[in-house]
Amino acid sequence: TVDFFIDRVKTALVQESNQLLGADLLIISSESIPESFATEAQQLGLSTASEIKFPSMNSNGDHNLLVEIRAVTKGYPLRGKIQLMSETSTTHGPSSTAISETWEIATDVPPAGTIWVDEKVLQQLELNKNNRIDVGATQLQVTEFIAREPDHSVGFINLGPRIMMNAADLEKTELIQLGSRISYNLQVAGDAEVVQRFRDWAQKRLNKAQRIEGIRDARPEIKAALERAEKFLNLAALASVVMAAAAIALAVRQFT
């Protein structure tokens, strides 16, 4: 019973930590990831989602800003939730810069034809909802403002302004060009043992442009914290066994 409880606590700790990654496992590549990886994961019963990240210069009138664009597919993120500023909390523009702390949970990714922007983009480009801004060769409509993302600042990098869009709109932006700095991410989530099986399978098929990351790989400080927590739980389990043995010994002495 004690071992079962400890295992449940360990599993919960890992799952909570994985929200910082947005998934249980990532395959990251500077090249397009072959469909075979997502197909294998899905055949094992795992959930998948894709994300393509790259820097881009965006503008609104006289305001220009270098941002990180994230083109995502349905299901993103697989762990954690995207928090959006509520409709009444975002009054921003030349005459108003007030932003309240109220927010709501996103239930999907941005619909095709729209984008979501974070607070830095909101402030520096002086945007309001329903503004249309140029994203490469197309225009997309701002429909939501992002308050928080589960995988923001993994490894304490990528802290710049961010725009999220639907991957279905990526081609018409014409932003993916030869020599572009692009990161292709495949998110995977599911039962821990099955995820490990997929990781073992994928590890044998990676090329030099690809790598696998779990939360312990991406965040060394999280790895250290998890290891300390696991040691504490193991000590707690040992202490429980010792206390139970002592209680049994005392009970036996009373009846002998």
Give each language-model segment a name:
Residues T1-V242, I248, Q254:
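Membrane transport/envelope proteins' first extracytoplasmic loop
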